[in-house]
Amino acid sequence: MSTDEILQKVLADTFADVTFSGGDPMFQPEGFTELAHAIKQRSRKNIWCYTGYTFESLLRNPRQAKLLEYIDVLVDGKFRQELRDEDLYFRGSRNQRLIDVQASLKANKTVSYRYNPGI
C-alpha cells in the first residue's frame, strides 16, 4: 500500500486521530515521516507514536528525530513484563512514558503528556 493510499484512508475518517505502532515505526522513519507530514498538512489530526526507543535516543538519530517533528504524543520505552501495570493509561509498563513531543522540542527537555480523562 502506498503512502497516498494510506493517507486517503486516514483522511476519510474525520473523527479518528492517528496512532503509529507495532513493529516499531522508528525502524522505518522516512516512510512514517512522509506520511506524518502529509497528515499534518491536510488535517488537524493528532498523531501518537509507540516505540521501544527512548525519546532521548530518538533525538540523537537525525532520521528518527525528523519524524518527531510531526508527532504529538510519544509513548516511549520497551514494554517490561516485570513493570506491567494495568492501571496506566495508554501504556503497559511503568517504565514507559507519555511525552508531549511538541512541548518537549520547544522546551529542549522532556515534557510529560498530561492525560485528562474528564475531557
Where are these regions (language model features)?
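Auxiliary Fe-S-binding modules of radical SAM enzymes
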Residues: 13, 43, 52-53, 59-119
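Conserved Radical SAM active-site core
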Residues: 1-67
